C-alpha cells in the first residue's frame, strides 16, 4: 500500500511536531520553511503535562528531560512582593527548556522518522483539494496539507478561514541570562506591579529565562532593544541581579501578543495547526503545548479514515479545549496587564482568594491536564 503524503507549511514547533507524528504513523512528509535556515525565535518555554505527553508520543521526551529544568514550584507575587500563589497545579509535571533546544529535539525526531525539510521554500497559498502553491508558481499535491505558518498564515488567508486576528494591546520581551547563584533552581517566579509583569525562569544548564511583559502604551517598558534596565529596576527592585545581567544588545525584543480565531481549522484536505489556527498570548504557558497535543490528535484521527472525513472530526474533538485555553489566557493577561492602577490591592486580594481553589486552578489551566481523547 502506498504511503499517504503530507505537505506541511512551516517548520516551527507545531509544524515539526505534526511532521514527526505523521511520519511515525507511516506517512511520507515534506516540510516547507521559507527561511534559508531552521531556527526558533525566543528564549525559554514551558512544557506542561500535555506537551510532555506529546513529546513522549513522538520519542522526544528524553531529549527535553535531559536539556531542560524540572520545575517543582511556581510562585506568583504582587506589587508589594507578597506571595499570592504557589505550586500552580500541584503535582503536575512541568519542564522549562530553551526554545532552541526544543526546536532541535523536534527536528531530530522528525528527520529520524524520515521527514524531508525544505528550507528557502516559500508557500504562498493552498487549495482545499490538497494543493500548495510555491512562490515560483509551481504547485505540489498531497493527501494532506497542514498550515503551520503562524499568525499571518498564508494558508489560512488563501482559504478564507480567518475570522479574526486581534491585537491584544500588550506584549513581552524575552531574554536569556547566564545563570548565577542568585537565580532560582527548580522554581519559577512571576511578579506583577501595575501593568508590568516580570518572570524569572530557570530553563537549562547555565541559563535563566527572563520575560518582561507590559501594555503597548508603556513606552519605557516596550523599549527592550537595546535593553535599558532602569525602568524595570524601578518597578522590580528585588530582581536587580537578573535585570542587570540582561544583555544590552542581545536578541531579546518586545513583541506583541495576538489572538487568532479561524472560521474552521480545516477545508477539504487542508488543516491549520498552532498559531495559524489559534494563536494566543503565552500567559498560561500553553500556546505551543496545545498545538503539540493537537498534532498527536491529528495523527490519531487520520488513521484508517479519509482525510476529508477525519479533519472535521479532529476539530470537533480538540477545538473546544483549545478555545477555552485561549480565552483564559486572554483573561489572565487582562488582569495582569490592563488592571486599573488604583485597584492593585483589590487585584491581589482577588487573585490570592481565587488561587486557593483547586477547582478553579484546574479550570483555568485546563489545557495542561488534558490530552486528546482521540489519542487515548
For each predicted feature, which ranges?
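Short beta-strand element of Class I
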Residues: 29
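Active-site substrate-recognition segment that forms the wall
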Residues: 187-219, 236
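Histidine-centered metal-chelating micro-motifs
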Residues: 153, 172-174, 196-199, 277-278
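Conserved mid-domain beta->alpha element of the FAD-binding
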Residues: 8-24, 32-35, 147, 251-335
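Conserved N-terminal glycine-rich FAD pyrophosphate-binding loop of Rossmann-like flavoproteins
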Residues: 36-54
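Conserved N-terminal helical subregion
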Residues: 2-6, 23, 48-159, 163-180, ...
